[in-house]
Amino acid sequence: QTSILTIQLHGGSTAEEVAALRDNLGPAGKLIYAAHVLGMQVTPALEPYYDLVDAVLLDSMDRETGKVGGTGMTHNWDVSAAAAAASPVPLTLAGGLTPDNVAGAIRHVRPFAVDANSALKGFDGSLDLNLCTAFVRNAKNAN
């Protein structure tokens, strides 16, 4: 047993596997399922997971390399907006979010939360305080 309370799954898990994990996690545990926007679709489809998870995260996928997450690429926010509107669980938007585009992304998609990584790093690869501050300020002022 561990004291892990939240697990974020990054695709590749079947609904049956997620259900088994949910059963073993216990009542205090939280599951976040990450899916990816590729073109005009979310992959994998989120509907089979809604009853099994506490939240979903939508991120970008690099079509050429197959890399998911941390690509610094945006995706079609119309797809994310439709997913957010249909989701019965909180949806976090990720994928190429920067201090310059986060407010527009929030206004367009209306996610529960936003997630950023690569665009907030300085030249040395560590988080840049000024970029993080600008990101949070712009996210808060999006409404």
Question: Where on the chain are the PLM-derived regions?
Answer:
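Secondary-structure boundary/capping motif
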Residues: Q41, K67, N101, D124-L127
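Proline-aspartate-enriched helix->loop->beta-strand connector
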Residues: I4, P111-V114
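C-terminal helical cap(s) of enzyme catalytic domains, especially alpha/beta-barrels
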Residues: A20-R22, I106-R107, N117-N143
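Glycine-centered flexibility sites
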Residues: G11-G12, G69-G72, G95-G96, A113, ...
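Conserved anion-binding
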Residues: Q1-L93
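Short, structured secondary-structure boundary patches
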Residues: G29-L31, V114-N117
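A C-terminal functional module that forms or caps the active site or interfaces directly
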Residues: L91-R107, K121
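Residue-level signal for the nucleotide or nucleotide-sugar donor/cofactor binding architecture
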Residues: H75, L97-D100, L127-N130
